[in-house]
């Protein structure tokens, strides 16, 4: 049976700890999985967070969304695959471990600690953080298979990556190439496009104009502009656009007459910046400049430039390129094929060498600035050019520049040999598969995704690092390669292993090989340096592994099949794949969402997921990013501690549309906590009365109950709510779901329905009207708790255990089925009509306030004036609610006669009619009522025609003295403010009842406790109160009311000129 609630007040901390204990003791999570094991499959793929640190509000938001979806699908009957994942390789981990160990370079890693120890430390760090993050996620009430997460460091996961790369190789989609790529000089590795997107930050760099002397021409120069002086030693050409107009300009510079060549369209801008005047001497098209040779400004400092000049026909000449623009610079572009993507391509076209005299740490390997970091060389190069007379102007520019996504070092462009996945060959397939098979939430993200795929180049997947999936590429001395697809294949092909520099030949038998390998290297571990030891033989050639590891984005890109252990475990893959749903932050559109589709189309020719949703970032209340420097970081634990898990969860799904950025607000959190407090109070009220009356819904004969209109209305509303919430979740418009729930709890259930039925709950004994209210409340909770369970799992469980479980029998609210709409209960007309009733009550209350009549004093009559048929039906059907809520003896539809005065609105008449405004005003004073009634008229005054509307008039109305009015959307409410003796007596009785009930509350009396009331008051009050003594006794549970000296617990109430005493009857 229903008991009185354990907690009278809503205390999230205690309640949630109690429920956590209940779930744990009763193994609820496992029971739910068992319950749904035969349901239709639903493959939810968890995007793996990096285990590089504690979770933040953004991570929490992400997991809360996921948990809500998983709980929702489970209640729908699905057997949900809910394995959490963790991204455990890559630079995010390496950088943290380097910091912890005080290491700054790759050389220090190899010499001070060693690769094997460094990898061991990375693994320890990753596993330790996995434990911390798991506990943090559990703290939020996230129900996933925490005992069996997928980890990208497991052998079977790595083997999935090898399988995928072998597939790419077999399809001709994996190849080695030399290209110019983003390079991090601190991490000493190449980075892919998707790692750099979103990592452009404002920084200041040099901005210099330099003149290149034209060979054989005295005082004639090519004028170039650059923000990377450090690339000038690698300059091999100057690019011009074939169709642009270029000019030779005569200038006076440093006391000398010189001739500069630059784009005609940029002459004024460039000369203005430099601060010189010029005269155009000659004009020509860019294509006419092709082949013009110049003298390299740093030829002496970089002797290899002399070799290039002699060996390559197009070295140090103007070449033609379409990438040249007129947006900045001079229209002549300094071109270094070893340090720019476009430079590289045009350099290849003209047969230029790919020269990059820079090492992995971004230091020059030769020439004047050998050993110096390139960005530190910038000022030295500028000063040197000035000394040589080639510097025209030096300044500074603030621009967006790419930085390393993990260590935040400014990147450089550098030509290196790397391994690429040829995504360019499958782009069209990716877009086609995406457009045909993937549903995006919101749908406009699909366009953004497709555009990102179109703009992407080949995927550089090699990284010159340590802690990652080793590239399964073995290479012979003559350059032949072989890609290994599995551990078994590696063992089968292995002929030897190298341990501490010593070669150990392996036996031919697979089993015997395994014994030797395990004895010498230890158990299978597909990381470096374990796999580096293997020497394989293919086509009669011995091969050793290339030392690179795989881009960490490839790790997560294969998650949909690697997490299932494919290809080692084919059964799960065949049962579940592709994923039914994924959801991640906005930055993953061009990262994880992209890497998955690219890897999947390469491996399986199709997409790896069917539905994908995107959410925004969490910012502070002002819209700023949370950071240590701003001191505005709010930790998830802090929110849970202050407001509780349910409040935190609901708030994150209620505050904003999921695809928008969430500006975290403590006020919003408190607003949600108040809503849950309201829900709790409705539960406490319901459970308290139901427990007193031993209410049992199983014994109710529903067909015999006389439900009131408000009962039918709330049952209709809660069934309509099912549609609203379900639609909000299904379309990923989560705020529609949460705000519908919020409004239902606060407005429909608490502020309206409970307000309407409170008196019915006070009735003693077996009252059918009270029973109908009990049953209605119980049915509402039955639906509402199911709807709220995925959002607020704790409070719904606590209420369910007391209010519902005794009669339903199922062990947990989370084991219930998602509610289905009872179409027979839905009455849309009633819902519309009740909405008008609420508006009328609001307007009527405002009218009473105008008249200064308290709600406790009844009024004689209320008139509703309306033209709306729905309002008329509502007033007729729900008249008793209006009478009760507005405390009126009579509520009628009618028309009130009042005096109308129409005057000219000179603010409109004057400006519009100017000199004729007096004529128009005179007409309005005489015929204004006609204009008011018709809305607009065309009139002729003294031979002139005018079009007049209600905008041209001001209407003043005079009501009868006994009425006061207030408008509502749909009509107007009139309150008759005449107070008779009978009405005064009734109102005064209500005033005293309210005060006696307040005193009962202060004494913490039970609703069934009886009292004796004694009242000291004025003679007038006593006479009025005696007319309603029965009412006072009934409402206050008093057995007697005496007018004498107040006794017992006494309170003086000056506003009603009384002292009231109450005594509990034992």
UniProtKB/Swiss-Prot annotation:
Motif ('HIGH' region): 49-59
Keyword Plastid: no
Subunit annotation: Monomer.
Cellular component, GO, one term: cytoplasm
Gene transcribed to yield this protein: ileS
Residues that hold ATP according to the record: 628
Disulfide bridge map: none
Broad class of the protein's primary localization: cytoplasm
General function of this protein: Catalyzes the attachment of isoleucine to tRNA(Ile). As IleRS can inadvertently accommodate and process structurally similar amino acids such as valine, to avoid such errors it has two additional distinct tRNA(Ile)-dependent editing activities. One activity is designated as 'pretransfer' editing and involves the hydrolysis of activated Val-AMP. The other activity is designated 'posttransfer' editing and involves deacylation of mischarged Val-tRNA(Ile).
Name listed for the protein in its UniProt record: Isoleucine--tRNA ligase
Entry's free-text remark on domains: IleRS has two distinct active sites: one for aminoacylation and one for editing. The misactivated valine is translocated from the active site to the editing site, which sterically excludes the correctly activated isoleucine. The single editing site contains two valyl binding pockets, one specific for each substrate (Val-AMP or Val-tRNA(Ile)).
Subcellular location: Cytoplasm
Example of a GO biological process term: isoleucyl-tRNA aminoacylation
Organism this protein belongs to: Pyrococcus horikoshii (strain ATCC 700860 / DSM 12428 / JCM 9974 / NBRC 100139 / OT-3)
Family according to the record: Belongs to the class-I aminoacyl-tRNA synthetase family. IleS type 2 subfamily.
Molecular-function GO term, any one: tRNA binding
Superkingdom classification of source: Archaea
Enzyme class (EC, first level): ligase
Flavoprotein listed as a keyword: no
Keywords per UniProt: Aminoacyl-tRNA synthetase, ATP-binding, Cytoplasm, Ligase, Metal-binding, Nucleotide-binding, Protein biosynthesis, Zinc
């Amino acid at each position: 049976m229903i008991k009185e609630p354990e907690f009278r007040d809503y205390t999230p901390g205690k309640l949630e700890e109690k429920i956590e204990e209940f779930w744990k003791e009763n193994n609820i999570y496992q029971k739910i999985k068992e319950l749904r094991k035969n349901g239709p499959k639903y493959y939810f793929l968890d995007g793996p967070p990096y285990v590089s640190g504690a979770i933040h509000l953004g991570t929490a938001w992400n997991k809360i969304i996921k948990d809500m979806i998983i709980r929702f699908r489970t209640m729908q009957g699905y057997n949900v695959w809910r394995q959490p994942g963790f991204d455990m390789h890559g630079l995010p981990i390496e950088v943290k471990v380097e910091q912890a160990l005080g290491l700054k370079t790759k050389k220090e890693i190899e010499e001070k600690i060693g690769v094997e120890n460094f990898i061991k430390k990375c693994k320890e760090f990753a596993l330790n953080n996995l434990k911390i993050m798991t506990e943090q996620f559990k703290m939020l009430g996230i129900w996933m298979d925490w005992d069996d997460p997928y980890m990208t460091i497991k052998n079977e996961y790595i083997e999935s990556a090898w399988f995928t790369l072998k597939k790419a190789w077999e399809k001709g989609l994996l190849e080695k190439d030399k290209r110019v790529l983003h390079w991090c000089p601190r991490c000493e590795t190449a980075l892919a496009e998707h790692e750099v997107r979103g990592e452009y930050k404002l920084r200041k760099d040099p901005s210099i104009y330099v003149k290149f002397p034209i060979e054989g021409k005295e005082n004639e120069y090519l004028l170039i502009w650059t923000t990377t002086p450090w690339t000038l030693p690698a300059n091999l050409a100057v690019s011009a656009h074939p169709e642009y107009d270029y000019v030779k300009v005569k200038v006076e510079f440093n006391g000398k007459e010189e001739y500069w060549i630059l784009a005609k369209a940029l002459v004024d801008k460039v000369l203005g910046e430099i601060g010189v005047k010029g005269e155009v001497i000659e004009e020509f098209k860019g294509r006419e400049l092709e082949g013009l040779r110049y003298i390299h400004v740093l030829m002496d400092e970089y002797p290899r430039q002399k070799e290039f000049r002699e060996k390559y026909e197009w070295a140090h000449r103007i070449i033609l390129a379409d990438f040249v623009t007129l947006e900045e610079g001079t229209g002549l572009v300094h071109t270094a094929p070893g340090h720019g993507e476009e430079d590289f391509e045009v350099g290849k076209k003209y047969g230029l060498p790919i020269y990059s005299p820079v090492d992995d740490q971004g230091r020059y390997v030769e020439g004047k600035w050998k050993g110096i970091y390139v960005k530190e060389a910038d000022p030295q190069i500028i000063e040197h050019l000035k000394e040589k007379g080639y510097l025209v102007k030096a300044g500074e520019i603030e621009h967006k520049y790419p930085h390393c996504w993990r260590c935040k070092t400014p990147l450089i462009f550098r030509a290196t040999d790397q391994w690429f996945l040829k995504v360019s060959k499958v782009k069209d397939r990716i877009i086609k598969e995406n457009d045909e098979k993937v549903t995006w939430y919101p749908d406009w993200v699909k366009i953004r995704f497709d555009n990102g795929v179109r703009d992407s180049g080949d995927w550089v997947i090699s990284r010159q690092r340590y802690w990652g999936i080793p590239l399964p590429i073995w290479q012979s001395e003559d350059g032949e390669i072989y890609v290994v697809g599995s551990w078994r294949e590696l063992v089968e092909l292995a002929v030897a292993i190298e341990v501490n520099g010593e070669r150990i030949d392996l036996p031919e038998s697979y089993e015997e090989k395994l014994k030797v390998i395990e004895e010498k290297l230890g158990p299978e571990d597909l990381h470096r340096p374990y796999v580096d030891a293997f020497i394989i033989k293919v086509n009669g050639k011995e091969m050793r592994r290339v030392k690179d590891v795989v881009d960490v984005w490839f790790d997560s890109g294969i998650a949909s099949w690697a997490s299932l252990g494919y290809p080692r475990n084919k059964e799960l893959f065949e049962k579940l794949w592709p994923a039914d749903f994924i959801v991640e932050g906005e930055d993953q559109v061009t990262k994880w969402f992209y890497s998955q589709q690219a890897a999947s189309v390469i491996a399986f020719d199709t997409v790896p997921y069917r539905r994908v949703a995107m959410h925004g970032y969490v910012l502070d209340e002002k819209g700023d990013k949370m950071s240590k420097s701003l001191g505005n970081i709010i930790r998830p634990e802090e929110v849970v501690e202050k407001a509780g898990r349910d409040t935190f969860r609901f708030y994150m799904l209620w505050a904003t549309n999921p695809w928008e950025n969430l500006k975290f607000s403590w006020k919003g959190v408190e607003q949600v906590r108040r809503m849950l407090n309201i829900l709790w109070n409705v539960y406490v009220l319901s459970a308290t009365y139901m427990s007193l009356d031993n209410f049992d819904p199983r014994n109710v004969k529903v067909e015999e109950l006389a439900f009131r209109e408000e009962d039918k209305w709330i049952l209709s509303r809660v069934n309509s709510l099912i549609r609203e919430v379900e639609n909000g979740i299904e379309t990923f418009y989560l705020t529609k779901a949460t705000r519908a729930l919020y409004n239902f709890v606060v407005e429909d259930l608490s502020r309206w329905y409970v307000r309407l039925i409170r008196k019915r709950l006070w009735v003693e004994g077996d009252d059918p009207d009270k029973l109908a209210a009990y049953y209605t409340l119980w049915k509402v909770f039955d639906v509402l708790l199911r709807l709220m369970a995925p959002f607020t799992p704790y409070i719904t469980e606590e209420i369910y255990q007391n209010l519902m479980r005794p009669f339903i029998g199922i062990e947990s609210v989370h084991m219930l089925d998602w509610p289905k709409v009872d179409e027979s209960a839905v009455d849309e007309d009633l819902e519309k009509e009740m909405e008008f009733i609420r508006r009328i009550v609001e307007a009527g209350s405002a009218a009473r306030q105008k008249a200064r009549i308290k709600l406790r004093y009844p009024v004689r009559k209320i008139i509703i004036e309306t033209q709306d048929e729905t309002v008329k039906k509502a007033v007729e059907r729900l008249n008793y609610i209006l009478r009760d809520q507005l405390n009126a003896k009579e509520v009628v539809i009618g028309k009130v006669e009042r005096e109308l005065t129409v005057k000219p609105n000179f603010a409109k008449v004057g400006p519009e009619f100017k000199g004729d405004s007096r004529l128009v005003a005179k007409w309005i004073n005489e015929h204004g009522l006609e204009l008011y009634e018709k809305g607009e008229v065309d009139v002729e005054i003294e031979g002139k025609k005018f079009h007049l509307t209600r905008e041209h008039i001001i209407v003043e109305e005079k009501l009868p003295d006994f009425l006061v009015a207030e408008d509502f959307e749909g009509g107007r409410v009139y309150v008759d403010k005449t107070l008779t003796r009978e009405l005064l007596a009734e109102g005064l009785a209500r005033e005293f009842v309210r005060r006696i009930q307040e005193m009962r509350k202060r004494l913490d009396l039970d609703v069934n406790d009886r009292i004796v009331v004694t009242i000291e008051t004025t003679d007038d009050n006593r006479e009025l109160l005696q007319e309603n003594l029965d009412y006072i006794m009934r409402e206050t549970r008093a057995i007697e009311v005496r007018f004498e000296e107040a006794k017992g617990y006494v309170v003086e109430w000056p506003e009603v000129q009384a002292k009231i005493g109450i005594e509990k009857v034992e």
